[in-house]
């Protein structure tokens, strides 16, 4: 029987900014088709971990495997071929392009025809369909986050990385966005969401990972990490 390969395996990952080591042997996995929440207070090392996975920062040690491929410090095109797509904290949309142009921008990397991608996008994100000719820079913060997600999904990713999905958004918008994240997971896309505010992320995640000071301190189903998560936030992180 063939062993099931995880969407992501992080093994003994270390990273540094200059001479300051900020990740200390980080190890965890994202199973295929799962939504996983990477949690912890500000400065815990969550975004640094994400940047190592996304190829933005070269780790100083350890291993990153995406769908079974060893991809430490790989170029973005190689990561994309492995099925990885990242939505950074700043969302990465093009404000002077229309919603439609933003959605179409990455469709070259998809296996489906452009028309099918368009129909699928506006079915999943009807609010964007109503604004498809509008400049992306004129959308609300929540709509811009939806656009970033829609554009990422247009590439048919196997693994989606989300950084601070709720940053600067109203609670109702955050709730709507996480409902979409849950839907994405149910469609078979693996999702790793980095989040400082844990409650909403854990509502849709099958697995939660707690980080403090560059180390994983707890990992498990959301109900099983509650005490460690509380301790992480009460203790804080520099």
Where do the PLM segments sit?
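ABC-type ATPase nucleotide-binding domains, specifically the catalytic core motifs of the NBD
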Residues: 18, 74-76, 99-116, 124-129, ...
